[in-house]
Amino acid sequence: MHAFERRALTGGERDIARVVFGREIDLDGVRIQQAPPAPFAAMVPHRRTIVFSMWRAARDFSDVPAGERAWFVHELAHVWQARRGVVLAAAKLKALGRDAYEYRWEPGKRLCDYNIEQQAEIARHLYLARIGAPDPAAPSLDRLEQTWPIRQFA
């Protein structure tokens, strides 16, 4: 995509989203936007717009390798969080630091006990596990399922 180009989600991207989020996100309103190069990789500044900067947004994330699709899911997690009332800018400030994205699974720990970046990482890991390409460093599918509040879309 070119700088400032903006688009809706493709059918394949909607399918990716449903693997983790079911029907919890109004996908009709989600947009992908390419920003000019900046020090951030991607962000969700306007609740339903995912802005890519450091790297290029794919024309269709369903046509890229599983790892890139999983990062798309990470960004969709922020759209989902915003839909649930999370003020992303404030929550991001609380989630700053070298270990902002790292998490350790613990029995009984709920998703809300993790910061927004850890939640998005759990969504990313869950996506990979559900499609049969688990991250070897991530918790098992069973453990991820225990933490994630949305059951898999049928």
For the regions a language model picked out, list residue spans one by one.
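A short, surface-exposed helix-loop junction/capping segment
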Residues: 1-3
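Metalloprotease/metallohydrolase-associated module, dominated by Zn2+-dependent proteases
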Residues: 6-31, 45-49, 83-154
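Short, solvent-exposed loop/turn segments at secondary-structure junctions
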Residues: 35-39, 56-58, 77, 85-87, ...
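Short pre-active-site segment immediately N-terminal to the catalytic Zn-binding motif
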Residues: 40-42, 52-73, 110-112
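Active-site recognition of the HExxH zinc-binding catalytic motif
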Residues: 70-82
